[in-house]
Every structure is written in C-alpha cells, then in structure tokens.
Amino acid sequence: MIITPQDSCSFGKLTGDHYQAIRQSNDPALKALMDNYNIWAKGTTHDPEVASSVLFDTVAVYLAYTTEHLVMKNMGIRVTDEGVTAPDVNAQHMDVALDWTNLDTFHQYLTDRLLSPIVQ
C-alpha cells in the first residue's frame, strides 16, 4: 500500500508560469476547468488569477504509477485525534510519501499533462 499524507500532497499547487500556462490555455476542457474554479473560488480566500488551490488528488494519482521525485519510507502511521499524521510502530506498515526530491519537476510534469491533448 502507498499513501501520501497531507504533509507531502499539500505541495500539489500550481503557481507562477505553470499556473498561468493552464489559466491562459485555449483548450476547451481547461477553459471549463478554469470557469468552474473561478465560480468555486468566489466562496473562498483563493485568488484564481494567481494560483490554484491545493490539488491533493494529483499527487495520489501520480503515486498510482510512480514514486519518482518523492522521498518514500516504509513505516507504520496513524492519524491523531488532532488530524496529524504520526509515526506508529504498531500500525500496519505501508510506503509513505514523506517529501519531494524535486517538486518543480512534478509541477512541470503536471502542467505538461494538463496542456497535452486529450486522447480519445
């Protein structure tokens, strides 16, 4: 089993040139995505002109086929009552994504994937 606690997946956020490439794309699917993000962001503190929200699921999907660019450790973990992911030697061991070795490479990969034509 492989998991990505919030500690490592909370970095799945696009900003700067990566985000602007998505935001300014003429792709109909990305335009629809950005239209929906603009609507959603009205009820939040997010500024849709500047950055995405945290894209938690993108890291989980990435981990479904590779652990490249991630620091992985086989360990037992648990979630405390306060919602903190903590090591637990008595818990079932799993491969845990703890950190990134090259976060910018992931951001570039995610940007490239989103800008790629949809395969039908």
Language model regions located:
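N-terminal acidic, glycine/proline-rich low-complexity segments
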Residues: 1-120
